[in-house]
Amino acid sequence: MIKHFHFNKLSSGKKNNVPSPAKGVIQIKKSASQLTKGGAGHVPEYFVGIGTPISFYG
């Protein structure tokens, strides 16, 4: 039960701490290389991915 509580608090704190944007920026920076390789066609796809990086990266 203590572990569960800790996990819940960590999840809540992490979401409140705004780690998602930071992760998104890292992914965008990493994707920048792939974006250049992929071309402009991938730009809109990556833009949509920014909103849902987890879903996009699968």
Curated annotation (Swiss-Prot):
Impact after mutating residue 46 to A/C/D/E/F/G/H/I/K/L/M/N/P/Q/R/S/T/V/W/Y: Loss of RNAP inhibition
Q: Which domain of life is it from?
A: Bacteria
Q: What is the effect of changing residue 47 to I/M/R/S/W?
A: No change of RNAP inhibition but loss of bacterial growth inhibition
Q: What is the effect of changing residue 50 to A/L/M/N/P/R/T?
A: Increase in bacterial growth inhibition
GO cellular component terms listed in the entry, alphabetical order:
extracellular region
Q: Where in the cell does this protein reside?
A: Secreted
Q: Where does the entry annotate site (Essential for permeation into bacteria and for RNAP inhibition)?
A: 46
Record-marked site positions (Essential for permeation into bacteria): 41, 44, 47, 56-57
Q: What drives induction of this protein's expression?
A: At the onset of stationary growth phase.
Report keywords, A-Z.
Antibiotic, Antimicrobial, Bacteriocin, Isopeptide bond, Plasmid, Secreted
Q: Summarize the impact of residue 47 to A/C/D/E/F/G/H/K/L/N/P/Q/T/V/Y.
A: Loss of RNAP inhibition and loss of bacterial growth inhibition
- What's a single GO BP term from this record? defense response to bacterium
| Primary subcellular site in the record, as a coarse category | secreted
- Mark the transmembrane ranges: none
Q: What is the effect of changing residue 41 to A/C/D/E/F/G/H/I/K/L/M/N/P/Q/R/T/V/W/Y?
A: Loss of RNAP inhibition and loss of bacterial growth inhibition
Q: Which residues form the propeptide?
A: 1-37
The keyword Secreted is annotated on this UniProt entry: yes
Where on this protein does the Isoglutamyl glycine isopeptide (Gly-Glu) crosslink form? Answer: 38-45
The impact of changing residue 52 to A/F/H/L is: Increase in bacterial growth inhibition
Functional note: Peptide antibiotic that functions through inhibition of the bacterial DNA-dependent RNA polymerase (RNAP). Inhibits transcription by binding deep within RNAP secondary channel, where it sterically blocks the folding of the trigger loop, which is essential for efficient catalysis. In addition, it also seems to restrict access of nucleotide substrates to the catalytic center, and shows a partially competitive mode of inhibition with them. Exhibits potent bacteriocidal activity against a range of Enterobacteriaceae, including several pathogenic E.coli, Salmonella and Shigella strains.
What is the protein name for this chain? Microcin J25
The species this protein was found in:
Escherichia coli
